[in-house]
Amino acid sequence: SFTANCHNPEDFVISEIERGQLNFENEQIAAEYGAALKRQRIRRLNAMPWLKKIYIFIKAGFEHIIPEGLDHILFVLGLFFSSLKFRSLLIQVTAFTLAHSITLALAAIGLVKLQLSVVEPLIFLSIVWVALENTLFKQTTKWRPLVIFSFGLLHGLGFAALLTEYGLPKDSFISLLLAFNIGVELGQLAVLVIAFILVRAILINSKNKNKLKIPASIAIGSVGLFWFIESLI
């Protein structure tokens, strides 16, 4: 039987819940289940070869952007359409990457903590803000990198929420944190590359590239605003 094959009682309880044999009676049981599931994942990770763990966390970071992180995708696209000049885009993406890497690390070690219910609406507002700036200003403003850095701190907390839920084994903490962050960066890079290819395919004449900026930004901002309002209801 399954019970006999479980070396840890928590594994049996988790399995029974997932099979629908046990139900949540209150929030405490739900919280205990989540904690047990996290401990189970950590036990399984500890038993894996190091390279396999690295692969799993790079994959998890990438998938947190593509296909799961539509909010982060829209934010990165907002940066892309803010300036189709490589230098300006590079400065913004670097500021965003540096910022979210800082808060991701701080949150992972427990120095920074903010409820996801607070972080998510602010992330949605960051999408709206970037889209609004794209629409109102022809050129990127001088303070834009600082604003993007601030928003990156928020997005890092969003990344950390998933990582904290997933669990990090203590003996591989730093390497797996870096692996997850690498996956996130690869996801962002993939978004930018795909966007660049599509824009080049749609608008062969480089002089027409700015024609996409305002309509694309309005669409991005509208989705961000909808999500923000929805998160408050």
Please describe what each predicted stretch is.
Residues 60, 64-233:
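Hydrophobic alpha-helical transmembrane segments in multi-pass membrane proteins
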